Amino acid sequence: MDDSFQRIKEKFEKFSVKRYWGDDFDVRFYLISQLKKIQEKSILDIGGGVGIISSELGESNYKINLDLSLDDLKNCNQNYGESISNINSSMTLLPFKDNSFDCIICSHLLEIAKDIDIKSNLVVKNDINQYPTIEKVFKEIHRIMKNDGILYLTTPNNTYYKSSKLTYQELTNSIKKYFKKYSLFFYNTYPNFSKKHRKFNFANSIPKIKLKFRNHSQIINSLVKSDEGIERESVSFYVEIRK
C-alpha cells in the first residue's frame, strides 16, 4: 500500500473520522498527487476543513486553509500548528488582495454552492450561468489568483450522483465566463450499463479489483481520462484552470 495513501487515511482516523471522503479511490487522492509537485508557492485551500490536503503539501509553500467551520479550523490548528495558516471566511467573499495566490484549491465545494442556490430559490432559469453563488466563487477566485496562477478544482459529476451535483455543461459554462484556459478530466469513468447498478456503487468495483494487482497510485492515475469535448460518464471531474 502506498505510504501517502496510508498516511492520509491515518490522519482522518486520528483527527476527524467523520470528514473522511468515504472512498479509497476518491478524486482528491489524485488531486493531492498533483499538488505535491508544487514548491515555494502561495497556496489557498478554499473550504479546506480540517486541513488534510494542505498538510500533504510541501513545507516550502505558504499555505492558507480557509473555511466557515470554526471547529474544523481549530482542529487544523491543533494538528498542524504554524505550518498552515487558518482563516474563517465565506467562499463568496475572500478576504485577500487582488493577485495574491500562485495556486488555489477548490475541492468538492461547487456542489455546495449549487445546493445553496437551489434551496434558496436563487437559480436563474434560461441563463447560461444559472447559479449565482457559483459565479461569485469563480469571480472571487479570478480576482485573487495571480496572472500566472493556477486553480485546482474537483467536484462530483451529476451523471453519477443524479442529485444537485454539477453537470459537465454547467461546470464548463461557469469556468468559461472567468477563465480562458482550462484542462478538464473525467475521473473514474464507467460504462453506461453500470447505471443500473448505481446502488451497488458498481463504478468503484473495478478499482477495488485492480488493487489486488497494482498499487494505489497506479490505480488512481489510471482513472483519469481527458476531456475530448464529449460528456462522459464519470464519478467526478478534475480540472486545472488558468487565467
Language-model regions, residue ranges each:
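Conserved class I S-adenosyl-L-methionine
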Residues: 1-37, 40-49
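Class I SAM-dependent methyltransferase SAM/SAH-binding core
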Residues: 50-93
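A conserved beta-strand element that flanks and buttresses the S-adenosyl-L-methionine
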Residues: 105
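A short glycine-rich, Lys/Arg-flanked "PGG" loop and its adjoining helix->strand segment in the class I
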Residues: 122-147
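Conserved beta-strand signature within the Rossmann-like core of class I S-adenosyl-L-methionine
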Residues: 148-155
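Short alpha-helix
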Residues: 164-178
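A C-terminal cap/extension of S-adenosyl-L-methionine-dependent methyltransferases
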Residues: 169-173, 183-243
